[in-house]
């Protein structure tokens, strides 16, 4: 916990610098700092200076904090405690409480979701141990062309908190929470508290609708939406401030392009909003100068650098998720399209509920602005653009199923809600923030005339927020309990297996239970040459060792079949225990 406190202090050094030097909103500063640190670490990692970059960033944060406190003490008569109270809003208190609750519950949380083993968790472990980006020689990471920004930041966190799966989850949560905190940027929550509570309610809706990704793992699908909305909020608030809006688009759009492959879609949305405000509010004599639109080029630089690195360092033709289109499977492609359309219209999916809420909010907005035709026209234009973007996102998701996903996964529309909900969250968040901003401009919070009623509303909205957070935490506790009692991956942890020395040992794993993924072996044994035994004795000759993970009946049946004896959980050399006939076969 003390290491976490120090880490937060180091981060706050940068936050205080942004607030003091550039007058950036305290709500927006945290995600700008985290994203900026990730991009800086990425740039150094390209130069093979990953570890020096992390130490430089970490200790520089303390120097900046010391300078800030020194300057503050000279320019203000306030004590540090008074300054803290003045800058620490009730929203900050709620988010601090959220973070502390999450840390308490997540510090012992294991990685659960499949993708944590196949790439996200494995990539963080690789960065932690090897302190460099992967190359084509590092076969242990199959998905090594995945953008690394969030993994690099999580690695930065675990380098100073200590390596554990719980610390990985806490690091990922820090990025998500910082992005959600930025939603409050355009609102004056001190003057009009109700708007702050409505934004909290929006976040609660996100918690409740998220039925697949959750924040107790390392998946980044929801983070894409939160970062995009954070960017929208910041760009709107600083639409007339070219310096800060340029900083926002360079950092957040650049970061989005390195969060996930589909992040470039949302980066382009941020760039489009930035260009719109630039064209509207910048009165420069030369409308299309290179200097004016230089931030756009800088925004695309991290993505271009990563693509160049992938092109130079990897043979991507071997990846199952590389872009392709097999014309011989047109009948299957047609089935995928039909199934995608039906699934998109299914009223029982969270993404459809989100679309329904968007339509409801648009209709309500049109109704309440009926007397203001000019404003109503703006809302209609905004809504039209919003639905066009959502349609484009759905079409791009369908194209991913058709061209960039293995057929066995595509035909089942694997992770449909997880992918579509990202776009829906962006749409729902955008229209909700617009509606709350309209509400803020029409409602004053100064009068005591309905103070009793307001307290009830505020209490109710805070209650809903913490109930939604509790829903996520209870879900995490249930998942953890099931995972511990039924999963194959957790057997590695029970046996204390967590190798940190990269190796090429060929290990055949004998185990039975749920979450039967080979990738858990890659993570814990730290070798690319490990697989679960599927019942075919002919494969045993290809391995150096067998690992018996448990004493379950199905596992021991396989052990008896291969060795002719019962073996306790542990490692065994194939030549010592396996029937010679199987080795020579």
Residue ranges and their predicted role:
Residues 40-45, 245-261, 265-272, 343:
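Membrane-interface alpha helices of multi-pass inner-membrane proteins
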Residues 108-111, 153, 276-280, 286-366, ...:
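Membrane-lumen/periplasm interface segments of specific transmembrane helices
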Residues 87-101, 251-253, 284-309, 383-389:
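Hydrophobic alpha-helical membrane-interfacial segments at the cytosolic entry of transmembrane helices
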Residues 466-520:
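Membrane-embedded, lumen/periplasm-facing catalytic core of multi-pass transferases
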Residues 244-253, 267, 271, 291-301, ...:
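Signature aromatic-anchored transmembrane alpha helix within multi-pass, membrane-resident enzymes
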Residues 109-123, 129-153, 163:
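Extracytoplasmic catalytic/substrate-binding loops of multi-pass membrane glycan-assembly enzymes
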Residues 125, 220-228, 265, 407-437:
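Hydrophobic/aromatic-rich transmembrane helices and adjacent perimembrane loops
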Residues 1-85:
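Membrane-embedded, hydrophobic transmembrane alpha-helices
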